[in-house]
Each structure stands twice: as C-alpha cells, then as structure tokens.
Amino acid sequence: MLILTRRVGETLMVGDDVTVTVLGVKGNQVRIGVNAPKEVAVHREEIYQRIQKEKDQEPSH
C-alpha cells in the first residue's frame, strides 16, 4: 500500500484521468473530492461491496 501525506487543497493523481483532492479535515473525518471519467466507477467501499454482493446473488441466464 502506498501511503501519502496531503494537506487540504492538495491533490494526488491516479493514472492519467483520476484526481483525488483533500477538501477538508474535521476530527477523524477527511472530505475528499474525486474527479474521474464517467466510465470509471467511484464508490465508497461499503457501497461497492453491496453492489458486488447483489451481482453475486443475481440468477445467471
């Protein structure tokens, strides 16, 4: 795992098309903004896991 330190307003790049910007820090919460092309799905981990679980439960044709 790559660990980076960023301050509010600073950005990191993921590949050529995705940026992640630290918008704010309040207590133990960090607000981030993600800019990505429409074809790149961006989800919170718990939402992504729910989507995957629902896909696994779909009957196959």
UniProtKB/Swiss-Prot annotation:
The keyword Chaperone does not apply. GO terms for molecular function: mRNA 5'-UTR binding. InterPro entries: CsrA, CsrA_sf. It is found in: Cytoplasm. One of its GO terms (biological process) is regulation of carbohydrate metabolic process. One of its GO terms (cellular component) is cytosol. Homodimer; the beta-strands of each monomer intercalate to form a hydrophobic core, while the alpha-helices form wings that extend away from the core. A key translational regulator that binds mRNA to regulate translation initiation and/or mRNA stability. Mediates global changes in gene expression, shifting from rapid growth to stress survival by linking envelope stress, the stringent response and the catabolite repression systems. Usually binds in the 5'-UTR; binding at or near the Shine-Dalgarno sequence prevents ribosome-binding, repressing translation, binding elsewhere in the 5'-UTR can activate translation and/or stabilize the mRNA. Its function is antagonized by small RNA(s). Belongs to the CsrA/RsmA family. This is Translational regulator CsrA. It comes from Stutzerimonas stutzeri (strain A1501) (Pseudomonas stutzeri).
